[in-house]
């Protein structure tokens, strides 16, 4: 029995309430594959679903990688760790490739508004960034380059078409700066991007509308937290907090 769009969306909302994000992602993938442009609500449901699905694997991957490094003296334990990490990596790669396929085949081509285009290109940058975190060799170079390209394209559209206080523009600046810091190891570029985004938003705080006030100020806070962390790390204080991202 094929479900119509409203039933699938309802199923995704139920799955979100139950914190069953794999089900939520499957429902929103089916909505996307129907080929219509997504509403803002549908777009957010899709994004939340996959962010949780991939987030669980990213977190598991970090834990296992760290355990693997600590068991260097015990070959058997290390081998087990390696195999388990590779299993998680394969899951993570499948999820990212799923999302990237939806973006390239349906979401980006169907986006009629600049806001949606920026949202989906940011998402493309994010999922290539997640792939690059677990990639090596040529594969790493390709994923890093694809991520940067998507972020850059989104960044240019956002500067031309959106207010500096728009939560999607701010969220993009946040994640693009994390990309520079973590993936390209360019702290100066990361700080400059985050600081510019923060300062431009502060200068236009009066353009904030009611709806997005909470989202925008939260992301501005994350930009500021990252700037504080990165500045202290570069002055030699080893901060251990993870970067905030959107």
UniProtKB/Swiss-Prot annotation:
One of its GO terms (biological process) is protein targeting. The modification 3'-nitrotyrosine is found at residues 84, 106. PROSITE patterns: 1433_1, 1433_2. The modification Phosphoserine is found at residues 60, 186, 232. The modification Phosphothreonine is found at residue 2. CDD domains: 14-3-3_beta_zeta (cd10022). GO terms for molecular function: protein domain specific binding; protein kinase inhibitor activity. InterPro entries: 14-3-3 (IPR000308), 14-3-3_CS (IPR023409), 14-3-3_dom_sf (IPR036815), 14-3-3_domain (IPR023410). Keywords: Acetylation, Cytoplasm, Isopeptide bond, Nitration, Phosphoprotein, Ubl conjugation. The modification N-acetylthreonine is found at residue 2. It comes from the Eukaryota. The keyword Hydrolase does not apply. The modification N-acetylmethionine is found at residue 1. One of its GO terms (cellular component) is melanosome. Homodimer. Interacts with SAMSN1 and PRKCE. Interacts with AKAP13. Interacts with SSH1 and TORC2/CRTC2. Interacts with ABL1; the interaction results in cytoplasmic location of ABL1 and inhibition of cABL-mediated apoptosis. Interacts with ROR2 (dimer); the interaction results in phosphorylation of YWHAB on tyrosine residues. Interacts with GAB2. Interacts with YAP1 (phosphorylated form). Interacts with the phosphorylated (by AKT1) form of SRPK2. Interacts with PKA-phosphorylated AANAT. Interacts with MYO1C. Interacts with SIRT2. Interacts with the 'Thr-369' phosphorylated form of DAPK2. PANTHER family: 14-3-3 PROTEIN (PTHR18860). This is 14-3-3 protein beta/alpha. It comes from Bos taurus (Bovine). The lineage of its organism: Eukaryota, Metazoa, Chordata, Craniata, Vertebrata. The gene is YWHAB.
């Amino acid at each position: 029995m094929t479900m119509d769009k409203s039933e699938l969306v309802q199923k995704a909302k139920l799955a979100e309430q139950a914190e069953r994000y794999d089900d939520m992602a499957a429902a929103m993938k089916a909505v996307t594959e129907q080929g219509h442009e997504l509403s803002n609500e549908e777009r957010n449901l899709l994004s939340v679903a996959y962010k949780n699905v991939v987030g669980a694997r990213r977190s598991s991957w970090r834990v296992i990688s760290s355990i693997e490094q600590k068991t260097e003296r015990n070959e058997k334990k290390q081998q087990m760790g390696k195999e388990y990490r590779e299993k998680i990596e394969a899951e993570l790669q499948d999820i990212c490739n799923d999302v990237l396929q939806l973006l390239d085949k349906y979401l980006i081509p169907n986006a009629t508004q600049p806001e949606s285009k920026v949202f989906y290109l940011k998402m493309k940058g994010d999922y290539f960034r997640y792939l690059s975190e677990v990639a090596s060799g040529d594969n790493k170079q390709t994923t890093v380059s694809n991520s940067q390209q998507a972020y850059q394209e989104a960044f240019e559209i956002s500067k031309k078409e959106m207010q500096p206080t728009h939560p999607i523009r701010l969220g993009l600046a946040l994640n693009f700066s994390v990309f520079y810091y973590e993936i390209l190891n360019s702290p100066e570029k990361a700080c400059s991007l985050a600081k510019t985004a923060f300062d431009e938003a502060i200068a236009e705080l009066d353009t904030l509308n009611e709806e997005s006030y909470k989202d925008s100020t939260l992301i501005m806070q994350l930009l500021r937290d990252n700037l504080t962390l990165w500045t202290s790390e570069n002055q030699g204080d080893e901060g251990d907090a993870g970067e905030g991202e959107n």
